[in-house]
């Protein structure tokens, strides 16, 4: 995955279960705490990303993380539920692999604070995505974050590099 891909997903509690179902339907495999720790320890060794997992197909990731037996033929990426974000949570940084961290926020303000912590750790200047029916939240995020773009209600991986129907240049 590129830097433009969804790296971390923050979901407010009121729609968390619904979002989890949607992520699983899209091919996500939700890991338990032990599996999450195994992926983290394998992907980051001595504070650096393991090149054996960078930009690899999901089959390679599943094999190297010993998750092949847990996955079905529809698995496209791994979901690492987590709580901590920022400097003391290495998984909240760049991954460049077929997995993302998933956070559950109490409300929008908590989600905004998590996004800022993630961005301050590794990502100042990177784009942020927001899915919301409340336009004011996009403005609030844009004003609070040190970002180049706030992508609203679009697939982040396509929209951040420009897209035919969103008006952003390629």
Where would I find each of the regions flagged by the language model?
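A general structural signal for short secondary-structure junctions and capping/turn motifs
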Residues: 1, 68-69, 92, 140-144
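Active-site PLP-lysine loop of aminotransferase-like
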Residues: 1-11
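Short, well-ordered alpha-helix to beta-strand connector turns
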Residues: 6, 99, 147-148
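Short aromatic/hydrophobic contact patches that present stacked aromatics
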Residues: 8, 100-101, 127-129
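Generic beta-strand/beta-sheet core signal
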Residues: 12, 80, 105, 131, ...
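NAD(P)-dependent aldehyde/semialdehyde dehydrogenase
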Residues: 14-17, 24-124
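Hydrophobic packing residues within well-ordered alpha-helices of enzyme cores
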Residues: 19, 23, 138-141
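C-terminal core of ALDH-fold dehydrogenases
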Residues: 113-170
């Amino acid at each position: 995955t590129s830097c433009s891909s969804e790296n971390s997903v923050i979901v407010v509690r009121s729609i968390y279960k619904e979002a989890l179902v949607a992520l699983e339907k899209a091919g996500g495999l939700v890991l338990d705490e032990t599996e999450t720790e195994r992926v983290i320890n394998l992907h980051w060794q001595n504070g650096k990303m393991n090149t054996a997992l960078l930009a690899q197909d999901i089959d390679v990731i599943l094999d190297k993380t010993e998750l092949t037996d847990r996955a079905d033929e529809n698995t496209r990426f791994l979901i690492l539920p987590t709580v901590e974000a920022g400097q003391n949570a290495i998984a909240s940084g760049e991954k460049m692999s077929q997995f993302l961290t998933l956070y559950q926020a109490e409300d929008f303000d908590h989600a905004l604070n998590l996004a800022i912590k993630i961005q301050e750790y590794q990502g100042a200047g990177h784009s942020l995505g927001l899915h919301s029916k409340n336009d004011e939240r996009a403005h609030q995020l844009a004003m609070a974050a040190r970002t180049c773009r706030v992508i609203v209600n679009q697939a982040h991986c396509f929209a951040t590099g420009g897209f035919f129907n969103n008006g952003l240049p390629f």
